[in-house]
Amino acid sequence: MNYEESRAYIRAAELKKGIVLGLDNMRELMRRLGDPQDELKYVHVAGTNGKGSVIAYLYSALSGAGYRVGRYISPAVYSYRERMEVNGEPVSREKFAAYVTRIAEVIDDIVKEGKPHPSVFEIETAAAFLYFQDEKCDIVLMEVGMGGDLDATNIIRTTVLSILVSISMDHTAFLGNTLSEIAEKKAGIIKPDSHMVTVKQQPEAEAVIRRICEEQNVPYEVADRDDAEVLEASMTGQTFLYKGEKYTISLAGAYQKENAVAALRALEILNEQGYPTTQEQRQDGLKRTTWPGRFALLGTKPDFVVDGAHNPAAADMLAASVERYFKGRRIIYIMGMFRDKDYRKVIRKTEKYADTILTIAAPDNPRALSPGELADAVREFHSDVRPYDDIESAVAEAYHLAGTEGVIIAFGSLAFLGDLTEIIKKHNGGNND
């Protein structure tokens, strides 16, 4: 297969198999591929919101310290191949095609034996393991796809460190209807006799994580956002004090302090586990971290911000950031949501800041609410809402409504943020300022 054929193969697999939780298929697939995952060292990250940001901080700091660092994330924002990278370089088209070709041959044998066809995420995760093995990574930063205990990434037997970011209600159809049930699934990545760190969790989630740590003989370590004091914050970044040292980050979201503190606590633990970094490397790593679609300022006059808030907890964080930076300004929203998310709660938590809300849909995505459906839901809470069938028209209208002094905030599913970002860049004459 060439690259285009490998992508077509994956799209076809999506039609055969949707979301699958359980490790039997993955174990069978990886066994036939030679279990490349067993040759690597991992930092495994689970939770509802903040996984990508914490991984971005660690990736920057560890790469800057000279380690060969693999990173596996989903979804990608700009390029599909961003899902698997080593030291800032995405997997090449040729290598990705070769991995998928090899995996497809193994899957043919599996299916001929009457066993289930692996899911898209299982195929992608298998390709990532093959890639990181080939690249001889010193350490791999692995983001859970959904949940934790039964996620395809949890095929790994040991971890250098498990990290739990903020846990809240999401994917309830798969993970459970209470915070305790969801925390149980996500804390399933904690391996016996290993190390873990969690951000400060809600009491129900904390109780579950403490119990699992005790059962697995793992010290319960908390990265507490209250240990950091914000000294200054603007849309271009934040400076905070943590354990007597100053750190600057370029990510503006009010919630980024928590993610940065989680990364710093993780780096302290990794220091003791054979991955030392200096104070300067940690400071430089955090300062250099970029992460698209996380309360990111992509243009000025008007200010144009994009954010991946797609569930109620993320909506709370978005609201806090809007309150911090844009209170009293004229605000236009561009919103796109998936139908399997609690979009009504997202609307309810954010609508009061908007003068006008424009609704769009992620292109060619069956999970996306149509602009009309989303507009109908918004009208339950907000009177000035306008649906747009294409993203470019919505952006043009947002610029018209905002003028030069207003604020445009595009948020919701990351699936449309890549397209949106390209449109904004074009509007700005090809650069981001």
Where on the chain are the PLM-derived regions?
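C-terminal helical cap/extension that packs against the catalytic core
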Residues: 202-221, 236, 303-306, 312, ...
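Active-site-proximal loop/hinge segments that shape catalytic or ion-binding/gating pockets
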Residues: 413
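Short functional linear segments
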Residues: 1-47, 54-67, 71-72, 108-116
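Beta-strand->loop->alpha-helix junctions that form or flank phosphate-binding loops
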Residues: 73, 199-200, 212-234, 250-254, ...
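ATP-dependent carboxylate-amine ligase catalytic core
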Residues: 28-30, 35-38, 64-157
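Acidic, Mg2+-coordinating active-site environments of NTP-dependent enzymes
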Residues: 111, 135-139, 143, 159-246, ...
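Short, high-confidence coil segments that cap the C-terminus of an alpha-helix
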Residues: 135-138, 328, 403-405
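Nucleotide phosphate-binding/pyrophosphate-handling subdomain across enzymes
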Residues: 39, 139-142, 150-163, 167-171, ...
